[in-house]
Amino acid sequence: MKMKSKFSVFGAAVVSAFIGLTPLLASAGEVNVYSYRKPKLIDPMFEVFTEQTGIKVNSVFAKKGMLERLQSEGANSPADLVFTVDIGRLSDIQNAGLTQSVNSARFEENIPENYREPKGHWFGLTTRTRIIVTSKDRVKPGEITTYEQLTDPKWKGRICTRSGKHVYMVALTASMIAHHGEAEAKKWLAGLKSNLARKPQGNDRAQVKAIKEGVCDIAVINHYYMVKMLKDPEQVPWANSVNMVFPNQDGRGAHMNVSGMALTKHAPNRANAIKLMEFLASAQGQEMYVQKNGEYPVKAGVPLSPLQNFWGPFKEDSLSLAVVADNRAAAIRLADEVRYND
């Protein structure tokens, strides 16, 4: 009932926003994609896939309202595949009953088990890690090395983060629940809140800017925002003002998340969709993805970007993202209980 109520308020506006789009028609030589990722990132890969297979890829950029659109279209949806970012968005689509399972030996070969839904409802395509960044001027190298140390009282008034209920922060908190239990995770989140320099606000890049401006000394961000800032002349000084810390390298490793894909429940071009999924999980598809967006490949042995090679290898947390997804509701509740955003 809660989901229906939410859709009644928001869904009509979302659906109307798509009315002007040309319908995607099912075809034996096509595959239809709803994508959270921007066309400039994924279209080059689709073009190569089409050249190799003759299968045309029709894509719709749907950063907002993807789940609501799929719900409204129901069995008449032309969508075969969904591309999105964060385990939360993938699991939300699955939990809404909008995906179907896929069995493929190529996925088992190319995608580690912790980046796959156990029954094949979603698959990670690239990984991103949630790193700690610290002021080069005000924090000594090695002074903070773990997520747990973010609660140290010596950092009081010195940390910036985005909203505690944003999907990236929710996933991190969910991983803390998985590793430490809910009670300890709540203490951790409350301790982090007590060390904030300001009310949570802005995106990940805004936290790095705040360090450059002296608002805070430490922030928690997704690693690829460093790549994005280094490509923007205005933001290069922000990136150059911080050191990157891959957390928990002497323990479980850095928290990981994914961009991923899922086969829709009513996919009209199922066979073509699976071919595209397998291409994107292949060495060729993975390398194209990684070179475009600065994220890491899920497939082992794929060449990294020059910047990733400069950063060097790091230890990844091997926690299953399906477990992270299961703890998301509790993580959101904890953010409310500690009044993280207040």
Residue map of PLM features:
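Early extracytoplasmic/lumenal segment of secretory-pathway proteins
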Residues: A28-D92
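Short beta-strand->loop
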Residues: Y34-R37, T99-E108, P118-K119, W122-F123, T134-K136, G142, E148, I218, ...
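A structural signal for short loop-to-beta-strand junctions that line the ligand-binding cleft
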Residues: S77-V82, Q100-I132, E148, R158-T161
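Periplasmic solute-binding protein
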Residues: I87-L98, E117-T145, T173-A174, M256-A262
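Ligand-binding pocket segment of bilobal, Venus flytrap-like solute-binding proteins
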Residues: Y168, S175, H179-P247
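Mature extracytoplasmic/periplasmic domains
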Residues: S259-S318
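Extracellular/periplasmic bilobal clamshell ligand-binding domains
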Residues: P306-D342
